[in-house]
Amino acid sequence: MKTWKTNLEETKQRYINWWNHKGIILSMWEHFQEGVKPHADIAPPAPARDLSQKWFDPQWRAEYLDWYVAHSSLMADMLPVANTQLGPGSLAAILGGVFEGGEDTIWIHPDPNFNDEIVFNPEHPNWLLHKELLKACKAKANGNYFVGMPDLMEGLDVLAALKGTDMVLLDTVMQSEVLEQQMQQINDIYFKVFDELYDIIREGDEMAFCYFSSWAPGKMSKLQSDISTMISQDDYRRFVQPFIREQCQKIDYTLYHLDGVGAMHHLPALLEIEELNAIQWTPGVGEPQGGSPKWYDLYK
């Protein structure tokens, strides 16, 4: 693989060091294009006809991302990677959630026909879209950049997208045993989906993730539970921790996205997961950002 990033091997080594808790990576979550000399003479596609084409036309997105990466800065440790996200938590769409394309993001609405059955349909259009998008991007990339893993998400967040957050919170009390079974079913489907998508995007054993500018020499994923801000520590250890632990045991490199001060009370449970490689901290709206001295004790 010979990418447009001239110092990729040095960046890979810094990532390997970082996964082993050594050194730092100098990067950013998104690319910037101002003042960048294009890496290749690639023209942008014609403007998207509508939001549906912008997000859900694999060929159009592949052409757009090819142009985008070709015109993006790859300085320092910024990765050459196509952002293939189909909305945060797109595993929910694979399981029946409803896509809606917005100007800047994709929304996933609850399945109006959801009946508490967690079913993976290999012919579901949203699953086929994931595969078609990644295959189109991989063909267009031609080894010049990585194709990122979409932001599938997992667990309670996926179920909340399928049936609504309020209903999932009620389930922790009203049908807790059913909820545990659903968490295992979602995890089982997650691994099937992840592995099939990994086989499309992998470069040897290596892969990149569409968010957080992440690369690893093997399977890698970002994990999270945003709904955890609304549940107790006991419920987290019952409905979240075991399934995050299973993901960390089965995926080589894992990064947990701890989002907001409301989720901080679950940090002890996260630290109990020995296989978890790293925690990414986002303080949230109205709080000083990650470099603030306010969080130094947290980092210690």
Spans of features found by a protein language model:
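Active-site loop segments of alpha/beta catalytic cores
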Residues: M1-L51, A62-E63, Y68, S72-N83, ...
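Trp/Phe/Arg-rich N-terminal binding region typifying the photolyase-homology
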Residues: Q53-W55
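A contiguous, low-structure linker/loop signature
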Residues: V81-D116
